[in-house]
Amino acid sequence: MALVVKGKVNINEFIDLTKMEKILPSMFTPVKSVMCSKVDKIMVHENESLSEVNLLKGVKLIDSGYVCLAGLVVTGEWNLPDNCRGGVSVCLVDKRMERADEATLGSYYTAAAKKRFQFKVVPNYAITTQDAMKNVWQVLVNIRNVKMSAGFCPLSLEFVSVCIVYRNNIKLGLREKITSVRDGGPMELTEEVVDEFMEDVPMSIRLAKFRSRTGKKSDVRKGKISSSDRSAPNKNYRNVKDFGGMSFKKNNLIDDDSETTVAESDSF
């Protein structure tokens, strides 16, 4: 008798995309493709075992990309007569994690009297494609008080996962843009201009403080632009900074009529 997950796996039980994410083109969202894996099986012969499981079986991965294990459906079948005593605990494990409490992703207990069972796990985290190819997930099975002779299989387990495969984590849309370029300004952003502009970025401030504690001077301190090299601030914009003929305006979204460079598509 073949073991199958009855019906189709309902992806909506694991992934809730917003309306905006559904209509945006792929370049504006890291979600590239949602896939269901092929079934992987474990035939349990021992009372306690830790077995490798391929949760990405049949999933097409992207080179130098990521895969998110959004959800997992586990189906089990007891290969026993009716009304047998005992039970089993099934636990999904991420073998990369060294602390046991952090490696445990979810567990389930059921009695042997329940001939067939099914449960869902929602790990909902991503790993790199390189890690995924190393088959990082395992299943810990602990059968208790089931009296069967050695060498036989009291329990069969099958696994189907829902995965999100994508190339980049970055989302386009939140950008700084050049609003104007005047005569006499530099043809490119020099290191000094970039350093001073980055002073307004919170993470840059944190990095500067960290480097000062370790005795390393930030390049921002080494090369300040003289006041004669700077253009007068544009008072019409509150959040505008001018650097040698280029003015930057902080903006949450790129206007449709502005010149932008579109990032490389993550299609495959």
Curated annotation (Swiss-Prot):
Family matches, as InterPro entries: TMV_movement, Viral_movement
Any coiled-coil regions, as ranges: none
Polar residues biased stretches: 225-237
Main location: host cell
Superkingdom to which the source organism belongs: Viruses
UniProt subcellular location: Host cytoplasm, Host cytoskeleton; Host cell junction, Host plasmodesma
Keyword vocabulary terms for this entry: Cleavage on pair of basic residues, Host cell junction, Host cytoplasm, Host cytoskeleton, Host-virus interaction, RNA-binding, Transport, Viral movement protein
GO biological process terms, semicolon-separated: transport of virus in host, cell to cell
Cellular component terms per the entry's GO annotation: host cell cytoplasm; host cell plasmodesma; host cytoskeleton
Region (Disordered): 218-246
Molecular function terms from GO: double-stranded DNA binding; RNA binding
Function noted in UniProt: Transports viral genome to neighboring plant cells directly through plasmosdesmata, without any budding. The movement protein allows efficient cell to cell propagation, by bypassing the host cell wall barrier. Forms a ribonucleoprotein complex with viral RNA. Binds microtubules and modulates microtubule stability. Can bind double-stranded DNA. Triggers host hypersensitive defense reaction in incompatible plants harboring resistance (R) proteins.
Quaternary assembly: Binds to host RBCS at the plasmodesmata; this interaction seems required for viral systemic movement. In resistant plants, interacts with host MBP2C at host microtubules; this interaction prevents virus cell to cell movement. In resistant plants, interacts with host resistance (R) protein (e.g. tomato ToMV resistance protein TM-2(2), AC Q71BG9) at the host plasma membrane; this interaction triggers host defense responses leading to programmed cell death.
Family: Belongs to the tobamovirus movement protein family.
Name the UniProt record assigns to this protein: Movement protein
Species: Tobacco mosaic virus (strain OM)
Gene: MP
